Amino acid sequence: MTILNRFCRTILLTNLELTNCGIRKNNSYKCRSFTHTINIDTNHIVPIHTQSNITLELFQPKISVVGVGGGGGNAVNHMISQSLEGVEFFVCNTDSQDLIKSNSINKIQLGPQLTKGHGAGANPEKGRLAAEESKNKIIQTFKDTDLLFLAAGMGGGTGTGSSPIIAKTIKEFKKETIIVGVVTVPFNFEGKRKEIIAKKGLEELSKYVDTLVVISNQNLLDASKSDIQLEQAFLMVDEILHTGIRSIANIINVPGMINLDYSDVVNILKNRKGLSRIGFGEASGEDRAYKAVHKAIKNPLIEIDDQKFTGLLVNISGGNDITLNEISKTINYLQQNADPDVQVFVGHTVDNSLLGKIRISCLFVH
């Protein structure tokens, strides 16, 4: 029986409730707040229903998602359609027609004087100048945000040129804001010019975000069926962006057996250098925990073989049929496959739409 398993069962036997464990360096654990416990007969996770006369003031971070440019706007539309809870959505674009079509109610037209609403014409410099023109609007919109996810497609004009200025502007106004860039880089068929523009955009954006997660469209295409339609390919990209942002937001917002403090999430996201990757895995049936975590860390999208990662943020999602033993197995597997110096933080969220399944997401950060 693992340390975590023994520890949890000891807590149960003394009628204490467990919800919050974070794996720390050297395999030490810490626990804090309590909202779920284990049904000893079934070994399943169940919510705790308690009454208390104590009034607590809880810090609820404001989480925002902003889609910049056409690609970022499409990603936000997809997230809104999937009912991602606990976050507020925004779109920023130079193209007024794209803004009109957006499902988000919070819209910023970038550089209206410069572009007259006609877009940046695939020119990152015009995108940069448009964002510079709209700095005051950007500050006013995001001044109260604590955690910002910035979604964009690299290789065009607005997403590539405006995103770094948006991130820089917010950081200069409120340095405590944690900014996570979640961006895509082009398919090979989009040409060398877009590839070069995207690379320069990544370099510039990485200066101003805390964590930069990069998703390769080409890797996604290579890992999918060869006859996939273009529309399906871009929808898959939007779903990857959605899943990545949801996994981090849910660790903070959704109750579960293991709820990380916001400070833990900040610790692993803040001031990271280099490009980060995210992997996902979902499985059902026998050995579903092992299968899901194996898929997540061996995901072809994340390209981690030649990179040194210093942190790993993991979200384990499942219905109330998920067992403590499955969570323990997942944590053990991650420990065995991670460098001893890597900080590993694990959160668990309950999602009863996943009854019979386990979904695991892993954010690898520098």
From Swiss-Prot:
MF-aspect GO terms: GTP binding; GTPase activity
InterPro entries (UniProt xref): Cell_div_FtsZ, Cell_div_FtsZ_CS, FtsZ/CetZ, FtsZ_C, Tub_FtsZ_C, Tubulin/FtsZ_2-layer-sand-dom, Tubulin/FtsZ_GTPase_sf, Tubulin_FtsZ_GTPase
Record's subcellular location: Mitochondrion
Residues the record lists as binding GTP: 70-74, 157-159, 190, 238
Domain of life assignment: Eukaryota
Gene Ontology cellular component terms for the protein in this record: cell division site; cytoplasm; mitochondrial matrix
Aminoacyl-tRNA synthetase as UniProt keyword: no
GO biological process: cell division; mitochondrion organization; negative regulation of mitochondrial fission; negative regulation of mitochondrial fusion; organelle fission
One Pfam family it belongs to: Tubulin
Family affiliation: Belongs to the FtsZ family.
HAMAP family: FtsZ
Listed name of the protein: Mitochondrial division protein fszB
Organism of origin: Dictyostelium discoideum (Social amoeba)
